[in-house]
């Protein structure tokens, strides 16, 4: 465990306001047992969390979920965060968004909006989201967001069922005048891990997608188009654990809808007790709690991590992934080619290459499925 003085303050607070959501994406990062989570922080409790985070030095606040638009107090939360000096970002599916709400959010001081899509066409988007009306609503709201003058990021979670249309995805983003595009290769936690065999792209799909994005970047740069398509790492398909280091208490605290403070979306599954913000202050949690300090620094690392010349870059990789795939969070992340458990990744790749799971065979993120699992 590191002494408190060696730990830098958190820069970004991700507030998962709720697990309620009108969509049913089979790759959702929310916990499988979300149906068992009954509590949400009140308006006043959230504002107190914001105040504590700002006092610690946090400068950016993301409103997430579930779908944050299901919170009727969202304008009040935005205003409180803005008054505290946060740069605020709404991370939304766009379902439930209206021009009237955009006006209210602007009045409250919202700085930035990210809208997620499931695909570049209505049919595939409907199949993945579990809603036939979602695609047109997203299109309308993306246009409305730009009309209201917000900076806008469009987010697409990529997996085997939509990655081959990546050229059409980028074309749609250009058409909608997105300021940035996040092509986020599916991260296999939560519902995505449950559906991994049916979602994991093949290596050939990833290579083709990267080539398409590289070509677009070159052509768009030459034409002066400022839209920036950014590809988030391919997770199980390559060794790039350095992209995960911020998820283990370096600069990314997350506050979940049930009052628990977590260092990442998936840390709930670890055999570590994480504290509630109703019982301890954020400052105390960040600097002194066992859960947030358990995997800081290098002392906890086994070999080959401890003597690896890249440990200051990847921080031993993802503890949640190590736990999911090996049953022991202390093990070297199997994504690393040096890991004695790397065979599990090779096995997952082989399964992906042989898989013929259709979209309708996936387990969708909804309350009924959550209750069946738990």
Curated annotation (Swiss-Prot):
Disulfide links within the chain: none
SMART domains for the chain: Elp3
GO molecular function, one term: iron ion binding
UniProt xrefs under SUPFAM superfamilies: Radical SAM enzymes (SSF102114)
Keywords in alphabetical order: 4Fe-4S, Iron, Iron-sulfur, Metal-binding, Oxidoreductase, PQQ biosynthesis, S-adenosyl-L-methionine
Pfam families membership: Fer4_12, Radical_SAM
Radical SAM core domain: residues covered: 7-222
GO BP: any one term: pyrroloquinoline quinone biosynthetic process
PANTHER family per UniProt: PQQA PEPTIDE CYCLASE (PTHR11228:SF7), RADICAL SAM DOMAIN PROTEIN (PTHR11228)
Family (UniProt): Belongs to the radical SAM superfamily. PqqE family.
Self-association state and partner proteins as the record states: Interacts with PqqD. The interaction is necessary for activity of PqqE.
Record's function text: Catalyzes the cross-linking of a glutamate residue and a tyrosine residue in the PqqA protein as part of the biosynthesis of pyrroloquinoline quinone (PQQ).
Record protein name field: PqqA peptide cyclase
Species this chain originates from: Kluyvera intermedia (Enterobacter intermedius)
């Amino acid at each position: 465990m590191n002494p408190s003085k060696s730990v830098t303050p958190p820069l970004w607070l991700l507030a998962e306001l709720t697990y309620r959501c009108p969509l049913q994406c089979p790759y959702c990062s929310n916990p499988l047992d979300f149906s068992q989570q009954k509590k949400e922080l009140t308006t006043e409790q959230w504002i107190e969390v914001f105040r504590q985070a700002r006092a610690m030095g946090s400068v950016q606040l993301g409103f997430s979920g579930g779908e944050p638009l299901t919170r009727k107090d969202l304008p009040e939360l935005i205003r409180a965060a803005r008054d505290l000096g946060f740069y605020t970002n709404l991370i939304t599916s766009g379902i439930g968004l209206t021009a009237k709400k955009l006006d209210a959010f602007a009045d409250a001081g919202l700085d930035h909006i990210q809208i997620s899509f499931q695909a570049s066409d209505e049919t595939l988007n409907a199949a993945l989201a579990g809603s036939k009306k979602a695609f047109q609503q997203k299109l309308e709201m993306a246009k409305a967001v730009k009309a209201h003058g917000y900076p806008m990021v469009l987010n697409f979670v990529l997996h085997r069922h939509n990655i081959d249309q990546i050229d059409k995805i980028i074309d749609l983003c250009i058409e909608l005048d997105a300021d940035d595009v996040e092509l986020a290769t599916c991260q296999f936690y939560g519902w995505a891990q449950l559906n991994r065999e049916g979602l994991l792209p093949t290596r050939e799909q990833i290579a083709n997608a990267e080539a398409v994005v590289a070509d677009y970047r070159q052509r768009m740069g030459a034409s002066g188009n400022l839209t920036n398509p950014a590809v988030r790492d391919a997770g199980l398909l390559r060794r790039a654990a350095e992209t995960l280091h911020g998820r283990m208490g370096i600069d990314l605290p997350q506050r979940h809808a049930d009052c628990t403070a977590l260092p990442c979306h998936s840390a709930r599954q670890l055999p570590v007790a994480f504290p509630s913000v109703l019982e301890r202050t954020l400052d105390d949690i960040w600097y002194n709690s066992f859960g947030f300090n358990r995997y800081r620094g290098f002392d906890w690392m086994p070999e080959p991590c401890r003597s690896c010349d890249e440990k200051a870059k990847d921080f031993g990789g993802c503890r949640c992934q190590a736990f999911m795939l090996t049953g022991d969070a202390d093990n070297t992340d199997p994504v690393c080619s040096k890991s004695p458990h790397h065979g599990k990744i090779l096995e997952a790749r082989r399964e992906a290459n042989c898989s013929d799971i259709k979209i309708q065979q996936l387990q969708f993120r909804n309350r009924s499925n959550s209750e069946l699992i738990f």
